[in-house]
Curated annotation (Swiss-Prot):
Binding-site list for [2Fe-2S] cluster: 122, 195
Pfam families, per database record: ILV_EDD_C, ILVD_EDD_N
HAMAP family noted in UniProt: IlvD
Gene3D superfamilies to which the protein is assigned, alphabetical: IlvD/EDD C-terminal domain-like
Enzyme class, UniProt record, top EC level: lyase
UniProt similarity note: Belongs to the IlvD/Edd family.
An example molecular function term from Gene Ontology annotations: 2 iron, 2 sulfur cluster binding
N6-carboxylysine carried by residues: 124
Single GO biological process annotation from the record: L-valine biosynthetic process
The record's free-text note on cofactor binding: Binds 1 [2Fe-2S] cluster per subunit. This cluster acts as a Lewis acid cofactor.
Subunit (UniProt): Homodimer.
EC number: 4.2.1.9
Protein name from the UniProt record: Dihydroxy-acid dehydratase
Length: 616
């Protein structure tokens, strides 16, 4: 029978000092036999997805204490990728994931907490907390802040839905008037919550639900809706039950590594492909799997991508649907229900509620459930009122979207595409693979060949795009922006958005060893591995080289002879200490980022730290 981890700080005369300090936090004699549960919050006023979380830790804590636990809250950092985008701040985004994971480990292990409730929401916070949870392997429940309502405005006598990406594209489009750009900017992000499309934050919160580590509805229920409060209340109660099951009944099924098993990872990736999630999710699932000591690789993702259809299409892949529409159609469980009926899921998995997948679908899939309360929860909709307050409205859709022929979520028979929303490509400069969000690629450019325009920084590429130096038919290559080369593997949302602003969204491709925002769409291929800074062949591409992209056949090829590539590699190696570094880039980075770069692996490994360099 495992002992409560916290007992080492609360029992025994030699722990009098620790107990004295616990008493100073408000604990009493009656608390010293109870489980101590960390409430891992991520409130910050910098990030709209986290601005409403200040009081939500208290909600969870009250339920923990009412159920017989002791709650202790702390905060992690949270970087807003949208605000950090397009300048040096983006260098810090991905490294913040490791910092979050480490800080959770530090706090939880330093104070010997027995379990956790993780209150996350945005891009690197959910992955960082997920990595920490699987590393620590103590009972955990995730409950996120929830999605933002979609922006809405009237343009050309028509009400359209908007998000952050629309504001970026219109702001850079010289054909758009100042007044229209201002109108879109003011309408794009109307409430608290994670950006309203299937960008990285919402994708990861959906995947956490599919992994079984959060409750049904967590991935799609709006941040502003009153129904979301119940998820926080339930999390506080349930974590005490899970904790006691493990420590008092020796039930290891309560542990995250047993819930988020390899079968669950496969289900989560299947969901990701079916819903056309952010390409960043590949990076984060690979990283989380390593923390869980699960053998889940790019090869597994490639195999799944070849058999899973696209059953859901959401912004940025379409302007018609946002997360509020996914929720109305049944949310994550709605998509999982269709995948299950198609025979594409592992059914022998459980979630934090203790329900198997069939039990979860029976209770929460709007197509089959008889539970009116569940149907009512999925009718929770937007209010259209600007606010930074959680749970501030209780509007509901008149009806559910259960149309699996033409609705937001489709059945296998009516899939948006027989090919899924993500694909892994391989070729002579992506030997370990690269990722494309096929959900956002127009059918006309699934096969594309063009001359390379090579840039060794995102900034140079942006300048060239906006300066008219990139023309229809070009393949923009941005390299030395990988985990090590950036460092930090910047997102390329500005270059892809500016291609659209210049009318080149369907006329050019963009390839990088960096990554893309979940808001990116178009022929945007990222995570090229190995990256240039690790000696990857993307570092050998020259201006004018033809690059052939073949998404249907999962190929990407630099049309240069092996002999020529060998000669270029020899010339690169001859640069000595300067080999595999940018020739024409001046970028000063901090010691913290250099430390990150010294241990960073390429994207095919999840951009995690190289344990072999530390003897592990």
């Amino acid at each position: 029978m495992p002992k409560y981890r916290s007992a080492i700080t609360t029992h025994g005369r030699n722990m009098a000092g620790a107990r004295a300090l616990w008493r100073a936090t408000g604990m009493t004699d009656a608390d010293f036999g109870k489980p101590i549960i960390a409430v891992v919050n991520s409130f910050t006023q910098f990030v709209p997805g986290h601005v409403h979380l200040r009081d939500l830790g208290k909600l969870v804590a009250e339920q923990i204490e009412a159920a017989g636990g002791v709650a202790k809250e702390f905060n992690t950092i949270a970087v807003d990728d949208g605000i950090a985008m397009g300048h040096g701040g983006m260098l810090y985004s991905l490294p913040s994931r490791e910092l979050i994971a480490d800080s959770v480990e530090y706090m939880v292990n330093a104070h010997c907490a027995d379990a956790m409730v993780c209150i996350s929401n945005c891009d690197k916070i959910t992955p960082g907390m997920l990595m920490a949870s699987l590393r620590l392997n103590i009972p955990v429940i995730f409950v996120s802040g929830g999605p933002m309502e979609a922006g809405k405005t009237k343009l050309s006598d028509q009400i359209i839905k908007l998000d952050l990406v629309d504001a970026m594209i219109q702001g850079a489009d010289p054909k758009v008037s100042d007044s229209q750009s201002d109108q879109v900017e003011r309408s794009a992000c109307p409430t608290c919550g994670s950006c309203s499309g299937m960008f990285t934050a919402n994708s990861m919160n959906c995947l956490t639900e599919a992994l079984g580590l959060s409750q049904p509805g967590n991935g799609s229920l709006l941040a502003t809706h009153a129904d979301r409060k119940q998820l926080f209340l339930n999390a506080g109660k349930r974590i005490v039950e899970l904790t006691k099951r493990y420590y008092e009944q020796d039930d290891e099924s309560a542990l995250p590594r047993n819930i988020a098993s390899k079968a669950a990872f496969e289900n989560a990736m299947t969901l990701d492909i079916a819903m056309g999630g952010s390409t960043n999710t590949v990076l984060h699932l690979l990283a989380a799997a390593q923390e869980a000591e699960i053998d889940f690789t790019m090869s597994d993702i490639d195999k799944l991508s070849r058999k899973v259809p696209q059953l859901c299409k959401v912004a940025p892949s379409t302007q018609k649907y946002h997360m509020e529409d996914v929720h109305r159609a049944g949310g994550v469980i709605g998509i999982l229900g269709e995948l299950d009926r198609a025979g594409l899921l592992n059914r022998d998995v459980k979630n934090v509620l203790g329900l198997t997948l069939p039990q979860t679908l029976e209770q929460y899939d709007i197509i089959v459930t008889q539970d009116d309360a569940v149907k009512n929860m999925f009718r929770a909709g937007p209010a259209g009122i600007r606010t930074t307050q959680a749970f501030s409205q209780d509007c509901r859709w008149d009806t559910l979207d259960d149309d699996r022929s033409n609705g937001c979520i489709r059945s296998l028979e009516h899939a948006y595409s027989k090919d899924g929303g993500l694909a892994v490509l391989y070729g002579n400069f992506a030997e370990n693979g690269c990722i494309v969000k096929t959900a956002g690629v127009d059918d006309s450019i699934l096969k594309f060949t063009g001359p390379a325009k090579v840039y060794e920084s995102q900034d140079d590429a942006v300048e060239a795009i906006l300066g008219g130096k990139v023309v229809a038919g070009d393949v923009v290559v941005i390299r030395y922006e990988g985990p090590k080369g950036g460092p930090g593997m910047q997102e390329m949302l500005y270059p892809t958005s500016f291609l659209k602003s210049m009318g080149l969204g369907k006329a050019c491709a963009l390839i990088t060893d960096g990554r893309f925002s979940g808001g990116t769409s178009g022929l945007s291929i990222g995570h090229v591995s190995p990256e240039a800074a690790s000696g990857g062949s993307i570092g050998l591409i020259e201006d004018g080289d033809l690059i052939a992209i073949d998404i249907p056949n999962r190929g990407i090829q630099l049309q240069v002879s092996d002999a020529e590539l060998a000669a270029r590699r020899e010339a690169q190696e001859a640069r000595g200490d300067k080999a595999w570094t940018p020739k024409n880039r001046e970028r000063q980075v901090s010691f913290a980022l250099r430390a990150y770069a010294s241990l960073a692996t390429s994207a095919d490994k999840g951009a995690v730290r190289d344990k072999s360099k530390l003897g592990g």
